[in-house]
Amino acid sequence: MGFPLEKSEDEWKKELGPEKYRIMRQKGTEHPGAGRFTHQFPKQGVFVCAACKELLYKASTKFESHCGWPAFFDNLPGKVKRIEDNSYGMHRVEAVCANCGGHLGHIFKGEGYSNPTDERHCINSASLEFHNEATNDN
């Protein structure tokens, strides 16, 4: 599956380091509650892809889901690609960066959260970086 930014797996390994590589390129996950952004709720700013720095989520879309991972109810338009994921005998929707294809987490719908989209983007902290202000240097 092609993405605008493509690199070899060796390049990703060098750039990301072992833990981010495991999560972002091998579709791993963090332990619940272990991520640095799980309990942080900035009022403004943006979350970007840890691999390619593409803008992904506005801080204003982050909410407390009590699931153990950062949760967002919507991504910036066109920035997160949804891919059907039937691994481990489950039907889920994988969230990946639309620019580099890095694994972010999964998207769930209809869980009863009172947010504008009725979605929970359950995202690994290791897949994100936070910027206090919106930037155009992605």
Curated annotation (Swiss-Prot):
Name this polypeptide is given: Uncharacterized protein C216.04c
Protein family (similarity comment): Belongs to the MsrB Met sulfoxide reductase family.
One of the GO BP terms on file: cellular response to oxidative stress
Any one Pfam family match given in the protein's UniProt record, by short name: SelR
Cofactor binding: number and manner: Binds 1 zinc ion per subunit.
GO MF, one annotated term: peptide-methionine (R)-S-oxide reductase activity
Cofactor: Zn(2+)
Active site, renumbered: 122
Keywords assigned by UniProt, alphabetized: Cytoplasm, Metal-binding, Nucleus, Oxidoreductase, Zinc
Signal sequence, start to end: none
One of the record's GO cellular component terms: nucleus
Subcellular location: Cytoplasm; Nucleus
Domain named MsrB: residues: 9-133
Residues that hold Zn(2+) according to the record: 49, 52, 97, 100
Keyword Nucleus attached: yes
Organism for this UniProt entry: Schizosaccharomyces pombe (strain 972 / ATCC 24843) (Fission yeast)
SUPFAM superfamilies, A to Z: Mss4-like
